[in-house]
Regions:
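Short hinge/gating elements
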Residues: 88-96
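N-terminal, polar/charged subdomain of small-to-medium soluble alpha/beta proteins
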Residues: 1-89, 103-150
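A short acidic, glycine-rich active-site loop
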Residues: 95-104
Length: 150
């Protein structure tokens, strides 16, 4: 599983002209799944994101987590995070999980995140063309891969 975590002042997701998700201060999480992802990967990623200390404290030091600031979150599925650009110029998405595997992983990730945060998480819609708008805060962007836990 790969995730791109963006600290935002605001973010929204629009589908067919209808805004389906809208947050203020918090995190926009783009999540991409592969066939080899496990329950342990989801649990590790959930804990890591929820507890990342990337929000400023009173001394303007990144020392607070989303949980600490009671921030909001949008999770958007994005299979293109699993792109391979090793060969040629056209990305290959062979590593991306097929919908029958990715959808349950995505839904489980959302449920785990809601349990970890103790509140609802807003989402996009799996497999749908979405317009994702955001106002970066910082900017702060973190990329995490469960296959490379550095």
């Amino acid at each position: 599983m790969k995730a791109v975590i963006k600290r935002v002042s605001e973010a929204s997701v629009t589908i067919d002209g209808i805004k389906v998700a809208n947050i203020q201060k918090g995190l926009l999480v783009l999540a991409g799944f592969e066939d080899a992802d496990t329950k342990d990967d989801l649990e590790w990623m959930t804990s890591k994101i929820a507890n990342l200390r990337i929000f400023d404290d009173e001394n303007h030091v990144m020392n607070l987590s989303l949980k600490d600031i009671d921030g909001e979150m949008i999770i958007v599925s994005q299979f293109t995070l699993q792109a391979s650009t090793k060969k040629g110029n056209r990305p290959s998405y062979l590593k991306a999980a097929k919908p029958e595997i990715a959808i349950p992983l995505y839904e489980s990730f959302i449920k785990q995140m809601e349990a970890e945060l103790g509140k609802n998480v807003q989402t996009g819609k799996f497999g749908t063309d979405m317009k994702v708008a955001l106002l970066n805060d910082g900017p702060v962007t973190i990329v995490i891969d469960t296959k490379n836990k550095e």
